[in-house]
Amino acid sequence: MNARDYFDWVRDASRDAESIRQQLMALESRAKALGGGGFEPRTRSTPDPRRMEGRIVAYMQREGELKTRQEADYAIIGRACRLLYGEDEDGRGGVSAGCGTLHADVLWWRYLDDSPWKQVASVLGSSVTTCRAAHDAALRWIDESGTLFDAAEMYASYIKSR
């Protein structure tokens, strides 16, 4: 797996994590509307407790499935952050130390935040051309440094979990 493929995968995980976050919020709202969420006292009775129980069980199963996927996505995102900024994510390692902070930040905004080039450039106070050059140089550095040696295994495990 090369760096570009890896970061495309990271972008997919980032998008999925955001989608799951929104789905969990919607599920929570529905559960509260059904009377199954939160610890607030119920102010209305449910017409058929057996029907409600089935809905609550289905909600809990779906929530569990989504949270498992979200945890896998967060593991991928965390691994990418350590690759970009070092094990402590303090900028003293990874791409940040090997190429420069701009290079790491470009990859973060482009893939983990899923930002378009104009937004990446604006946030970083650089031109799109400079950001694209930093992007390409960072991907090249990652490929040449061999820092993705375990990414293929992680990807295979991720695919199996879907």
State where each predicted segment sits:
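Short amphipathic alpha helix immediately N-terminal
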Residues: A97-S115
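Short alpha-helical "recognition helix" segments of helix-turn-helix
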Residues: Q119-L124
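Short, well-structured alpha-helical interface segments that form or flank functional binding sites
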Residues: R15, S115, T130-A133
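DNA major-groove recognition helices of helix-turn-helix
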Residues: C131-S145, F149
